[in-house]
Amino acid sequence: MQIDISTQLPCSLAEVIAQVRTPRLLHQVASPLLSFSPLTPVEFPGTWSEGTYWVKLKLFGVLPIGRQAIVITYPQMENAQTFMLRDNGYSPLITKWDHVITAQEVSGGTLYRDRVTIEAGILTPFVWLFARQFYAHRQRRWAALAANGFSY
């Protein structure tokens, strides 16, 4: 199942790129619905490099819901005014969590888009329902952070 949601952010493409590359931003936009704790490597880097990061997930910061692989790549874009980050993640229960973030410079700011493909067997509809709410929450948090100059 797929999710495709976008929002226009009141900031430059360069600001979005700088922020989306940081685990710190992930914590900000996911909170308080999900929290991520690094397993392997044992600490998050200052910025995401291409590679696999295993994390422990907690719902509302307290309820353990398992572990997840965050698999970061930065696909090349033909258009210099568009940025892409891909997390082709998975977990023991979710066989596919393919999250593609694109950011594109538009008049008045940056168009930010989350596209997610989820496969989790018979759990897929339930995981999709949660993910739909989660990504809407993330985009609201993104918009609030961008409006405040990313001071967090």
Feature locations, PLM:
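Hydrophobic ligand-binding cavity/cleft-lining segments
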Residues: 1-49
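Solvent-exposed residues in well-ordered beta-strands and their adjoining turns
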Residues: 8-12, 56-60, 104-106, 117-119
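Glycine-rich portal/gate segments that line the openings of hydrophobic small-molecule binding cavities
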Residues: 38-88
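A non-catalytic, amphipathic alpha-helix used as a structural packing/dimerization or gating element
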Residues: 133-141
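Beta-strand/loop substructures that line and gate deep hydrophobic ligand-binding cavities in soluble
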Residues: 82-132
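Short, surface-exposed coil-to-beta transition loops
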Residues: 2-4, 65-71, 95-100
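Charged phosphate-binding loop/patch that engages nucleotide di/tri-phosphates or the phosphate backbone
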Residues: 140-152
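Hydrophobic pocket/interface hotspot
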Residues: 16-20, 26, 85, 103, ...
